[in-house]
């Protein structure tokens, strides 16, 4: 059965960005990172899920490139963690990957990152015990390094 997620209206997009900013604050505090802003990527951008600029500005795509439907919140958090890792390592080398997975693990421990979970508009739940990380990164994580 195909999962149906709504198209994003401006209010929902604003709420997602607010939620990403709150979650980012929890993550950067742990790692001593600083970012300038998190905003939604323009709807027409299809070549990337997110971008981190040298000045600390982060843009995250909230919509699927072809359907325009909301991406799952876990996908947005995955992208957020990836872009936060770029605040320390501006490449995709081994140190970047290790740091990215460390941020992702912390997001999982805080209950922010829940892969396979809820669509973007799902209500925020209380943090739960961290899931055990497998020895291999998930395919969704590796695809970010394409």
Q: What do the PLM-derived regions correspond to, one by one?
A:
Residues 1-78, 87-146:
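Active-site-proximal or metal-binding-adjacent scaffold patches in catalytic folds
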Residues 83:
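Walker B catalytic acidic pair
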């Amino acid at each position: 059965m195909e999962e149906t997620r709504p198209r994003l209206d401006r209010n929902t997009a604003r709420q997602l960005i607010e939620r990403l900013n709150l979650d980012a604050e929890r993550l950067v505090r742990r790692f001593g990172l600083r970012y300038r802003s998190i905003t939604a990527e323009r709807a027409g951008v299809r070549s990337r899920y997110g971008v981190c600029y040298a000045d600390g500005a982060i843009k995250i795509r909230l919509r699927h490139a072809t359907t325009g439907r909301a991406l799952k919140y876990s996908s947005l958090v995955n992208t957020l963690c990836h872009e936060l890792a770029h605040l320390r390592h501006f490449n995709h080398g081994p140190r970047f990957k290790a740091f990215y997975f460390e941020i992702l693990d912390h997001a999982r421990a805080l209950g922010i990152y829940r892969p396979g979970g809820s669509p973007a508009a799902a209500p925020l739940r209380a943090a739960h015990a961290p899931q055990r990380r497998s020895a291999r990164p998930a395919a969704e994580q590796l695809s970010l390094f394409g």
